Structure formats: C-alpha cells, structure tokens
Amino acid sequence: MSTVKITTTLGDIVVSLYDETPLHRDNFLKLAAEGYYDGLLFHRVIKDFMVQGGDPDSKGAPAGKRLGMGGPGYAVKAEINARLFHKRGALCAARLGDEVNPGRESSGSQFYIVWGSVYKPAQLKQMEKQMQQNQVTIAFNDLVAAHKDEIMDMRR
C-alpha cells in the first residue's frame, strides 16, 4: 500500500492507495509526481461527507466558475472491489453515474476523500464480516426459494 501526502492551506492530509486497485494507484502516483495536482482546488465540499479535487480547470479559477468536468483527457478502467468501500478517510476516484457511464470508468484525475462517520478498525472489520454473512444468507435464501418444492418433498 502506498501513501501520499496532500498539502493544503489548512494542513496536510495523508491518504493510502490500495494495491488491489493498481490502475488507479499508479495513475494517481504518476499525476502527483508530475505536479498535476499542484495548485488545484478542492472544488466540491459537502459538509460531514466529502471533499473533491483533481479538476485542472480549478487552477486559478475565478470565483463562481463551474468546476468538476476537467481532466487529463482519459478515463481509468473500473476496478470495483467489494472489500474496498467508502469509509472515512478513503481516497476514491470520481466518476460519472452509471446511466451515462455504463463501464463505470473513473475520471483520469478527479478524486474525493470521504469524511462521514468515524469508525474504529474493529468496527469496520465487523461491518465487513456482516456484509459477507448477509451475502451468504441471501444466496442461501435464493437457493431455498428456487428449490422449495423439492425441499418440501424431502421433508415428507
């Protein structure tokens, strides 16, 4: 896992980049090394949820300019991983919604950092276990529903 320090006028933010998403990790590291993010704004801030940055159009943008559509001219192939969910402190790739982006590709440069709720690592681990158990339960219930008649015959 790689870490990156984002220096802002309000202090530093250290984020982790997962090895399980190598295309996104390598792209972010490349852009950071090139200085792509230097001087860019966090152009979207939603209180108690997230901040978004990475739009090159935000560099030197006048107040009131609509931001959020700029990028390096390419997208990053989706690397969806159910284990990596949007928990507090997570660095996430921004993307357009599924209805206009069925491939679920990410912006080439825009990202957001989730603030949301504060959880202890043990709480996050328990939530992950519960989600996995829920998936097993759903699969089991689907099988039971599909074979209900056979199961009832076996019980007789």
Predicted regions and their residues:
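Cyclophilin-like peptidyl-prolyl cis-trans isomerases
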Residues: 1-156
